[in-house]
Amino acid sequence: MRILSYGIVILSLLVFSFIEFGVHARPVVLVLSNDDLNSGGDDNGVGESSDFDEFGESEPKSEEELDPGSWRSIFEPDDSTVQAASPQYYSGLKKILSAASEGNFRLMEEAVDEIEAASSAGDPHAQSIMGFVYGIGMMREKSKSKSFLHHNFAAAGGNMQSKMALAFTYLRQDMHDKAVQLYAELAETAVNSFLISKDSPVVEPTRIHSGTEENKGALRKSRGEEDEDFQILEYQAQKGNANAMYKIGLFYYFGLRGLRRDHTKALHWFLKAVDKGEPRSMELLGEIYARGAGVERNYTKALEWLTLAAKEGLYSAFNGIGYLYVKGYGVDKKNYTKAREYFEKAVDNEDPSGHYNLGVLYLKGIGVNRDVRQATKYFFVAANAGQPKAFYQLAKMFHTGVGLKKNLEMATSFYKLVAERGPWSSLSRWALEAYLKGDVGKALILYSRMAEMGYEVAQSNAAWILDKYGERSMCMGVSGFCTDKERHERAHSLWWRASEQGNEHAALLIGDAYYYGRGTERDFVRAAEAYMHAKSQSNAQAMFNLGYMHEHGQGLPFDLHLAKRYYDESLQSDAAARLPVTLALASLWLRRNYADTVLVRVVDSLPEVYPKVETWIENVVFEEGNATILTLFVCLITILYLRERQRRQVVVVADPVAADVAQPLDADVAQHLAAFPR
């Protein structure tokens, strides 16, 4: 690449293989203002509404009830899995995944035909897949209208993944009144999945790339039992290390580090850790017995373990004890006063869940005088600590105008955060597992599905796979494997969506796409706009590119002063940019002092000449952006030559023997020489 591609397309400022600029992912941060907190609506509008009932009695729901048409039965089949309700759908889905893995275009054709037949017969889950197929242009001509129509039918039939896709579509169009309704339903399902079921709300989205390079550090930690660090930890645990036992128990309980959740193994390691005197395991044992995770549910044992943990100074255990008292589980009877006291103890020790549960008491008026504003403050503290249920309650408040000023945009954003933790988020884990096994095609399909549902990490992962692996990505187009045009267009669309959700590196890639005309018409003005957006997020490479465009008058006014300013800002933002910035400043010096000369015209022509001689240096220069590097390198050599020649002229003038024949040094030349230390 010429501008941006000095680095590897996403994060680095220069793409030559040995230089990378700093990489920083920018998370989306949602902030509540004082106006929101102080100007709330009707504080008395909640009453005893079940909408805000955290402590109500609810029946556990199965995976199929929470996520109809779930893909789990394909990736994690068990004896309880039932596919009889949609045999044609599951058959077609299996074939789609197999075709993506094998790169088998004929099988993919057969699979989509089978799915289409099921869709025409009214299967909502097959209709959801057809919405996906039309959305990306796989085996069918890309059609936003047909995709939208199929997702509507699927959502009406109860498919949650299509509801996610529709909600994100409405969100992108700022149709918050429609988006908020769907996200509210999805968030409620997500909350049910980790409040009622035995699964915990822990999500580990993994960005498989760091810039244009593979994120080797994160991927290494996601290899599960094959990870060398895990094997060392397991060895230490087997030798009696209590801390190692506790950590392994955590990994299995929450399904961390690429491990599948295994509550039985978690229970085994927590019990061994407790035997060795490890107190943190006591609290988790209390939670395990309260949830019935891997054991028969036993609230009496849960209370015993939580009480022991609290005595050991694990103050978050107070929150669990308070919950048992408010529900009347494992104790003589419900006792709201004791529940409040335990929640307050947890709050005094800054436990997020304690803040959340105390907020629920004030919201409902359970054991305390009802105070919605006080509840809001507790929810706010819990949300700042990342408590997903607190985001859910705040979303409801913004949605209904209870306790907070009604704000559908904020409600939608908060609901979305919670909805993305629903059972359908398992697609991310299966995609990562496929990628780690080298099954890039299956990973691409899974990430693309999640991208459609609005997951920013999945959008950038899918786009990166398309860019990084090219033909090896197993990308399927309308009538075969994706052409370069189809692949670039798909990647461009994905980067664009990720950019809209705050991914600064995606904005950088959008600028690249417009600058080089990849996946879209070449447009320097829109490229500059995208780079400006990335620059506003302190992206060094975007600053460099803006300097380059000012220097050459591409999409921005020709302005050498602004060019230098952006080059300098790039270096200030990232010290790794020193070499490219030095080369760029060398080019700028030539342009200032030798404008409209043959020398500058030759330098400017190098990017066009470069492809003709590329075969001569293909073992040295691999990226199109290196044409710019070659150009700047020539500039540097030229400047060094000119400076040396000028230095010799100065020496001649200073020589007393030659003084009588020496000509006075041009003032401009002297000024420029003074600017360069010798």
Curated annotation (Swiss-Prot):
Annotated Gene Ontology cellular component terms: endoplasmic reticulum; endoplasmic reticulum membrane
Region (Disordered): 40-71
Bilayer disposition of the protein: Single-pass membrane protein
Domain of life assignment: Eukaryota
Signal peptide interval: 1-25
InterPro entries: HRD3 (IPR044623), Sel1-like (IPR006597), TPR-like_helical_dom_sf (IPR011990)
Record's subcellular location: Endoplasmic reticulum membrane
Oligomeric and partner information: Interacts with OS9.
Family designation: Belongs to the sel-1 family.
Protein name: ERAD-associated E3 ubiquitin-protein ligase component HRD3A
